[in-house]
C-alpha cells in the first residue's frame, strides 16, 4: 500500500528532515561546481562575483538531480551565478511588479477578492531569475506581530475569500507557525480558500511532513498548493511521494513555471514537463514569460518566440495539460494572458 512505501522511504538518507537540509544548503559556486564535476572555465569563474548581487543558495537534494559534468544542465542554470547578471539591461527594473503597495506590513491586497501574505522572506533555493531578488523583505518581515495585523485586515475586508501565502517561500515557516496562521484564517468566515505558492516541495520534498499534510486535511479551508517546477528533471520519486500525500489530504495541486532561455525554451521540454507533472498529480497552470528584473535578462525569451513555442506545444499534448502563457505587469492587479495569435481555422 501507499502508506508502507512511504514509511520505507523515511529511512533513506535523503529523507533527512527539511530543517537539517536547509541548514546544509550549498552557498559557494565553487563547491556547487565541484559536486557536479564541472570544470570552472573563465566564464563560470567570472560568474562567481554575482553572488554579491544575490547570494547563491541550493539544497543538496536538488543538486542530486543535476547531471554530473554538464555545465549546461537545466537545473544548474536556474541556480548558478552568472556574469550576465551584471549587465544593466535597459527596461529591466529592480521592482518589476511595483509591489510597494502593501496595505499593512507583509500583506499585499492587489486583487479584489484575494490578498497575498508574505509569510517568510527567505527561500530554500535562490533562483537567479527571481522577480523578488530586490524585494525589501526587512520591512515586510514575517513576524507574529505583522501576521496578527494582517489577520485583522483580512477579517475587516469581507470581499477577501482567498488568501495567498507567498514570500520568499511560505513553507520556510515551520509547521507550528503554519498551523497558527491556518487556525486564524479558519476563524474568519468569509475566507474560503488558502493558496500556497512554494518552491520547497520540489527542491526539498521532505518539507511535506505528515504533520503538515494532516493539518491541511483537517482544515475547513480549501487548500491549493502551487508548485514551481521548470523542468521535468526536477521531478523525482520523493516529490511524487510528497504530492501523493497531499492529494490524499485533499489538496489541489497546481504548477507554475517560468519560460527560461537555456532551461525550458522549447516545446518538447515543456511537453515532457507537463507529462511529468500530470503523472505526479499536479496540473500545469501558468507558464510565465520572465519579469523584466535586473540581472535576469540573459534568461529572456521574446514574446514572439514564446507564442511560437506554445503553438507547437498545443500539437504535442492534450489541451488540459497546456499551461496558460502569462505575464505579470507592474501595477496591473492580475496576470495578463498573452494572446497566442491562434487564427480561427
List the model feature ranges, each with a label.
Residues 307-345:
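C-terminal accessory regions of radical SAM enzymes
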Residues 1-109:
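Flexible, acidic/Gly-rich N-terminal and inter-domain linker regions that tether
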Residues 148-162, 171-317:
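Conserved AdoMet/S-adenosylmethionine-binding subsite of the radical SAM
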Residues 130-142:
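Iron-sulfur (Fe-S) cluster-binding segments and ferredoxin-like electron-carrier domains
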Residues 55-58, 101-132:
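N-terminal pre-triad scaffold of radical SAM enzymes
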Amino acid at each position: 500500500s501507499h502508506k508502507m512505501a512511504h514509511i520505507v522511504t523515511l529511512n533513506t538518507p535523503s529523507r533527512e528532515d527539511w530543517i537539517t537540509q536547509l541548514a546544509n544548503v550549498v552557498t559557494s559556486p565553487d563547491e556547487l561546481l565541484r559536486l557536479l564535476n564541472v570544470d570552472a572555465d573563465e566564464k563560470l569563474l567570472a560568474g562567481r562575483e554575482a553572488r554579491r548581487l544575490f547570494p547563491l543558495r541550493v539544497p543538496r537534494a536538488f543538486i542530486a538531480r543535476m547531471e554530473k559534468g554538464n555545465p549546461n544542465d537545466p537545473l544548474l542554470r536556474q541556480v548558478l551565478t552568472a556574469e550576465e547578471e551584471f549587465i544593466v539591461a535597459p527596461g529591466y527594473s529592480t521592482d518589476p511588479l511595483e509591489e510597494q503597495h502593501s496595505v499593512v506590513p507583509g500583506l499585499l491586497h492587489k486583487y479584489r477578492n484575494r490578498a497575498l501574505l508574505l509569510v517568510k522572506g527567505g527561500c530554500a533555493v535562490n533562483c537567479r531569475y527571481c522577480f523578488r531578488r530586490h524585494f525589501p523583505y526587512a520591512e515586510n518581515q514575517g513576524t507574529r506581530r505583522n501576521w496578527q495585523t494582517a489577520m485583522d485586515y483580512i477579517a475587516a475586508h469581507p470581499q477577501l475569500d482567498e488568501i495567498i501565502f507567498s514570500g520568499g517561500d511560505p513553507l520556510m515557516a515551520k509547521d507550528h507557525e503554519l498551523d497558527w496562521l491556518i487556525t486564524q484564517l479558519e476563524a474568519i468566515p468569509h475566507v474560503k480558500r488558502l493558496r500556497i505558492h512554494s518552491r520547497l516541495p520540489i527542491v526539498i520534498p521532505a518539507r511535506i511532513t505528515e504533520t503538515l499534510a494532516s493539518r491541511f486535511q483537517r482544515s475547513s479551508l480549501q487548500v491549493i498548493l502551487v508548485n514551481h517546477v521548470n523542468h521535468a528533471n526536477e521531478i523525482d520519486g520523493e516529490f511524487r511521494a510528497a504530492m501523493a500525500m497531499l492529494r490524499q489530504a485533499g489538496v489541489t495541486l497546481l504548477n507554475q513555471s517560468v519560460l527560461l532561455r537555456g532551461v525550458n525554451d522549447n516545446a518538447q521540454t515543456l511537453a515532457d514537463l507537463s507529462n511529468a507533472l500530470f503523472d505526479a498529480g499536479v496540473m500545469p497552470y501558468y507558464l510565465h514569460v520572465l519579469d523584466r528584473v535586473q540581472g535576469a535578462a540573459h534568461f529572456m525569451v521574446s514574446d514572439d518566440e514564446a507564442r511560437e513555442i506554445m503553438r507547437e506545444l498545443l500539437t504535442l499534448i492534450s489541451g488540459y495539460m497546456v499551461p496558460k502563457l502569462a505575464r505579470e505587469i507592474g501595477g496591473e492587479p492580475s496576470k495578463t494572458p498573452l494572446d497566442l495569435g491562434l487564427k480561427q481555422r
